[in-house]
Amino acid sequence: NKFGKFDFPSVYLEVNLKNLKNLDLIRKRKFNHNDFDPEYVNASLKISDPKNPKEYKNIKVKLKPKGDREIHFMNLDSMSYKVDVRGKKNFVFGMEEMSIQKPIVRNYSWEILFHDLLKAEGIIGLDIVPIKFYRNGEYLGIFVIEESFSKELLEKQNRKEGPIITVNNNISHIFPNLNFKTYSERYWLSKKKDFFEKSNQNLENIKVNFEDKNFNLFDYFDTEKWARYFALIDLLKMYHGSSIKSVKLYYNPTTGLIEPIGYDGHFGSGYNDFAFIDLIHDPDFYCGWICTHDKNWLNLFFDPRNKDFIESYLLNLKRFTSKKYQKNIENHLNKKINNINNFFYSEYQGSDRVWFIGPLPYYFDENVIYERQKKLLKKIEFIENYFEKINQKNIAKKKQKILLINTFNSNEDIINQLANENIYLSKGYWILNNLKLIDKNIFLEEGSVVILQGENSFVGKNKVFKFSGPGMITQFNGEINLSNVKFSKIKNIKINGLNWSGAFNIINAKVIMNNVEIIDNSGEDAINIVGSKSNIDQLVVNNSFKDAVDIDFGELSFNKIICNTSGNDCLDTSGAFVSGGYLFGENIKDKLGSFGENSNIKIKEVSGKKVNFGVVSKDGSKSLIENLTLKNSKILAASYKKKHFFGNSNLKISKINSDENYQNAKDKILLSKPNSIIINNIEFKNFIKNKKILKKFYVGS
């Protein structure tokens, strides 16, 4: 492939002679003293990308040598860099923090495949971009840019900002005799101290109590994501990525649980006959250095008492070893990975021997994966018979407790009220399960927090079902069915360690709503729906303090949403798939429809009166509005970039009706390059600078 043409980007590093000499001195010192923490030097990058003709010139960066193996520091031309972009609105392929390294250091395309499959499974993975790398005009060969751990990583993958945690390798990386450290610790201590404290408290509790017979894995970890993570590691033999010193831990402030962030899987480090299955029937099964260093960490998950986790792990492993999943891998190899491999083959690349460069050239053999599937299938057959015997011991299934709440009321505390028309919930926490109520009035005392779990149904059959009073309601997992229900004067209440922004929150649940009204709420959102699958027939929000309806991730299908008087947006989406019939807003202080962060929007009719901004598609979102009707609107439509690590946005409006002639009113349509707006099948061409749009929308941006 030496003479093949490849459309991978070129990255040009410019560093002055003084700083280059400093880099080389630091590299040599790091080579001889691995515990040495090097300093940054200033430099700049320029990017030329055939897929994106716009050149990014002179992006200011700071960089230093990085790595924990000698292969990172062997010489100046092949050394690995840790790179941070200087400046708030500059990004390199959507990254603000990254590494630039030789492909062998990142396990060639095996690591890219690993992270792609993680992301396809809803697990946080890193972007890895192959590049042609130049330093001061000299071509140094093929390198890869790998994303680092930042809030941008989380937002791009539909997560709210939360602490990312790793192991302090300077002390120990053997669980539980280790110390954790948080990325950007100063930020968390100054901005969101409760998230920092709760995540660290949970990790310390795990270290102290993991051998206790009452220890509950489900209280601390998002076990479904961890089950998929370990099963995928089994498939690709990425066992290095299972080590506590490799995998990064994300504390999700929406769920209060820890999720994995894949890192450093490193295919090829042995383990042909091992799988995590072996630990289920034999906790002392020998599996080399992983079991030597991570025995307690792995047994934390693969203890047979963790019935739900093991069942989920086995189900995912069966899925990953199926013919259907093999076809998915083949398709991904053909679509992306094979081209990357051909790019790597275009220059001589020595095989990866972990600690050194092998004498043979690198070659990607996909048959290794398919042979691995066959081997795992045999192990699955054995363990299912073994696990069935274990299940006969009636090991109780465990449910997640919300660890942030120690004292609470339960169903037993309202059982005497259930026959009454009026139910009173006093100040404090109420964790209620599987309620099926009809024609009730539920009064929330000031400071009451109602957390619903399981399957809940509230129906106004002969009259309106009412929730009223200054308390907060949250459906946490499970399912909620609301029909003919009115929420009055509910409010958001802060719970330390959690990011629940609504007066009414729905998290990771199935939602059915018909004829629901929320009136006079207090808080950032009247209703915040996160990571859920929602079907709404009619939802009306009156007099919302800030956002009326906030959809973070997940799917929403609605017939009618109406907002009357909102202090901020009517419908605000982030990373959501939305299909709607009719959206109406009146007296909206900000945006009628705010669609951001890779949302995918299709709405038949959007209508508004006295709206500050009409519809906005930003930060990688794709939005289609069939009919837009606005009266007394400052801005009709806009497409721009608020968060520069997202891609381009587009907004298509099939038909627009307005008391303003948008074709002659350039200030009514706001568009920045390279985003797009199409109205009545005509592409809008009046571009203005993105920063000018931000000034109009966000004071002080």
Q: Over which residues does each language-model region extend?
A:
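Internal "kinase-insert"/substrate-recognition segments embedded within catalytic cores
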Residues: 121-126, 138-228
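Extracellular beta-rich repeat passengers
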Residues: 401-701
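Active-site substrate-binding loop specific to GH73 endo-beta-N-acetylglucosaminidase modules
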Residues: 166-167, 171-175, 249, 258-265, ...
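Conserved NTP-binding catalytic cores of kinases and kinase-like/nucleotidyltransferase enzymes
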Residues: 1-109, 113
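Surface-exposed patches in mature extracellular/periplasmic domains of secreted proteins
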Residues: 123-134, 216-220, 247, 324, ...
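Structural recognition of the beta-strand scaffold that forms the well-ordered cores
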Residues: 82-84, 99-102, 132, 141-145, ...
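A conserved helix-loop-beta module that forms one wall/lid of the active-site cleft
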Residues: 103-138
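Middle-to-C-terminal accessory/interaction subdomains
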Residues: 21, 197, 201-238, 242, ...
